[in-house]
Swiss-Prot record:
The lineage of its organism: Bacteria, Pseudomonadati, Pseudomonadota, Betaproteobacteria, Burkholderiales. GO terms for molecular function: ATP binding; CTP synthase activity; glutaminase activity; identical protein binding; metal ion binding. This is CTP synthase. It comes from Bordetella petrii (strain ATCC BAA-461 / DSM 12804 / CCUG 43448). GO terms for cellular component: cytosol. CDD domains: CTPS_N, GATase1_CTP_Synthase. HAMAP family: PyrG.
Length: 548
């Protein structure tokens, strides 16, 4: 029988519930337990696919093509289980499901209400997500409830968790509450009152936390922990100090040293073997003792909110771990390049253009790509970054003046990138769309496998085939591929059914690769990713060349 740990948050949002939940999962997995994680989002959107990155941050794409919360990326990076569509659901999905049942007559004429119909549906979704992992043999499912205790939006989720813990019975459910203990500079002390009130609010709705994770910018003294313990009715050893760390990969060890996993296992009636965090210790050692220092320029338009590129930033960190390199990521606004030029790129060891949507800032990205191509700077283009590399090459090398994407200029004289209208998904189902299709849920998404061209850099990196995740509407236009290849570009991977370009490279450049997919979604600190490791190795070589 699966046991559940519900993770809630109080006082303010953005305290790191996802990292806390993932770190706990990593410790439990190191103790031999089969663990999965779920994220419950209280917003009414069906998924975050059409939400602004400035509002939501990154959209993480799962293997089965779901557009989900960025916390699922943390989950996959911290544990071995893969996340799927069932691991993330929203208020919008819950209400959509309940209303569909009501229209079918499933409720037999009853008045449909938040309790019991919405809360029952939430519980069913939670159980379904837990059962989907480990062939139904999940030992522990950690359920992160989005939002902050006290918000109206998350009340149905909290009530569902309360009901579920009651139904499951003793030693089958536990509650972990993450809260803030702010330091007030003018008073020169930490304040515990917000945490006391947050726990009080939680207890008012019938939830009594087994464990408090108290976030602060510094370790919390024992006397302050004792005060929190007394006023929240949580044992002192279960009031955990979680201070700011310079790497999220230090959090599992921080929690384990304070006995978090023992407290959770005791609450769940589990007696697994001791934790083995040697892998995490090795990762931290590699982070703290690099042999190289590199500056990678990430040129985008969401650079004011780096959460928009969370998986990508972490993938570069992972590559740094596996090449013993300290990676300094410099986020560069592409619109700034349009006004100030490319001189600001001269100090970079490599340049990366990530995925994105819309016309704004694209000419600045194209200018950065041209700089990388003409100056031998290692370049990695992901999704839009590959499309723009093709546009830049078409304009300045292949002689296709005015080349563009129909996303930015529908009447471009040379539409080297265009909307794909028909393709086959990972299950073999034919999908169709046109310019009038809904934006939500209509992209080519999820993992797809394709063969790699022999003798290319792509083959040296991936081997004979590549299996990566996608999230895009536009593709390189096959009509122009012969002209691009004549000018020196190599299309090094194509989809097996539609023959669409998946990878491009320039063989006469030290390292210039574009990929239509999103490799950052499969990078982990444990294994890194061969594409990012190759990119960072090229950056190391470029740095050495500049220093010589």
């Amino acid at each position: 029988m699966t046991k559940y740990v519900f993770v809630t948050g109080g006082v303010v949002s953005s305290l790191g519930k996802g990292i806390a939940a993932a770190s706990l999962a990593a410790i439990l997995e190191s103790r031999g337990l089969q663990v999965t994680l779920l994220k419950l989002d209280p917003y009414i959107n069906v998924d975050p696919g059409t939400m602004s990155p400035f509002q939501h941050g990154e959209v993480f794409v799962t293997e089965d093509g779901a557009e989900t919360d960025l916390d699922l990326g943390h989950y996959e990076r911290f544990i071995s289980a893969k996340m799927h569509k069932v691991n993330n659901f929203t208020t919008g999905q819950i209400y959509e499901s309940v209303l569909r049942k009501e229209r079918r007559g499933d409720y037999l004429g009853k008045t449909v209400q938040v309790i019991p119909h919405i809360t029952n549906e939430i519980q069913d979704f939670i159980a379904r997500g837990a059962d989907a992992a480990w062939n139904g043999a999940t030992d522990v499912a950690i359920v992160e409830i989005g939002g902050t205790v006290g918000d109206i939006e998350s009340l149905p989720f909290l009530e569902a968790a309360r009901q579920m813990s009651l139904r499951l019975g003793r030693n089958n459910a536990a509650f972990v509450h993450l809260t803030l203990v702010p330091f007030i500079a003018s008073a020169g002390e930490l304040k515990t009152k917000p945490t006391q009130h947050s726990v009080q609010k939680l207890r008012e709705i019938g939830i009594y936390p087994n464990l408090l994770l108290c976030r602060a910018d510094r370790p919390i003294p024992d006397d302050e922990r004792a005060k929190i313990s007394m006023f929240s009715n949580v044992p002192l050893d279960a009031v955990i100090s979680v201070w700011d760390a310079d790497s999220i990969y230090k959090i599992p060890a921080m929690l384990h040293k304070q006995g978090v996993d023992n407290i959770v296992c005791e609450a769940l009636g589990l007696t697994p073997p001791p934790a083995d965090l040697s892998m995490w210790d090795n990762l931290v050692d590699a982070l703290e003792h690099p042999t190289h220092q590199l500056t990678i320029g990430m040129v985008g338009k969401y650079v004011d909110l780096t959460e928009s590129y969370k998986s990508l930033s972490e993938a570069l960190v992972h590559a740094g771990i596996h090449t013993r390199s300290k990676i300094n990521i410099e986020y560069i606004d592409s619109e700034d390049i349009e006004t100030r030029g490319t001189d600001q790129l001269k100090h970079l060891d490599a340049i990366l253009v990530p995925g994105g949507f819309g016309k704004r800032g694209t000419e600045g990205k194209i200018a950065a790509i041209r700089y990388a191509r003409e100056n031998g700077v290692p370049y990695l283009g992901i999704c839009l970054g590959m499309q723009l590399a093709v546009i830049e090459f078409a304009r300045h090398v292949a002689g296709l003046g005015g080349a563009n994407s129909t996303e930015f200029d529908p009447s471009a004289p040379h539409p080297v990138v265009a909307l794909i209208t028909e393709w086959m998904d990972r299950e073999g189902k034919v999908e169709k769309r046109d310019a009038t299709s809904d934006l939500g849920g209509t992209m080519r998404k999820g993992a797809q496998r394709c063969p790699v061209k022999p003798g290319t850099r792509a083959q040296a990196i991936y081997g004979d085939d590549v299996n990566e995740r996608h999230r895009h509407r536009y593709e390189v236009n096959n009509v122009y591929v012969p002209r691009l290849e004549e000018a020196g570009m190599v299309i090094s991977a194509r989809t097996p059914t539609e023959n669409l370009p998946e990878m491009m490279e320039l063989p006469d450049h030290p390292w210039f690769v574009g990929v239509q997919f999103h490799p950052e979604f499969t990078s982990t600190p444990r294994d890194g990713h061969p594409l990012f490791s190759s990119f960072i190795e090229a950056a190391i070589a470029n740095h050495a060349r500049k220093e010589a």
